[in-house]
């Protein structure tokens, strides 16, 4: 597991260095989010969970070091939740390496426009990460994520890329989602996933998608309902 995490960490650090935005010293002062989970509570507060890597790289060393951290923040808005998480982190949290935006069923039903606006208005957030609705308990997802060998965002990104030729898999990144909304009377879609506990180990499994109207979830398409 440590070997695989080190390999993933090397990929993340290489991509950061490759785009030329950070040097070794700067990387050691930043925590990078690899995925964001958007949720809402019973009081309509925004709850954010981010799966992060805190890397460490020395120009004189050949190996990459770092550790995984999962933060939770709550606020009236996403920005308030992010500020709360930054207070808990000794390093600044950076969102330029996010690979997946994940919405709980409740967040998707209540509407995702404010989250899309956050992504659209902050240059740290990219338009290439895939969007998903997660059907299940967030704590279960966090437990599976914490015990797994791979970062949630990277795992979902690789899972979609591996299944691009599978007509049963629904996928959309932020750019796809917004473009579809503009040309289809505010109707769009995104992928969905569940935790499959039929096997000996609980595993994340892509499972259909959701139909969005005016940025609110109006229907769910399970994998068995998708026409191949």
What feature does the model see in each segment?
Residues 2-228:
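Membrane-proximal alpha-helical signals and transmembrane carboxylates
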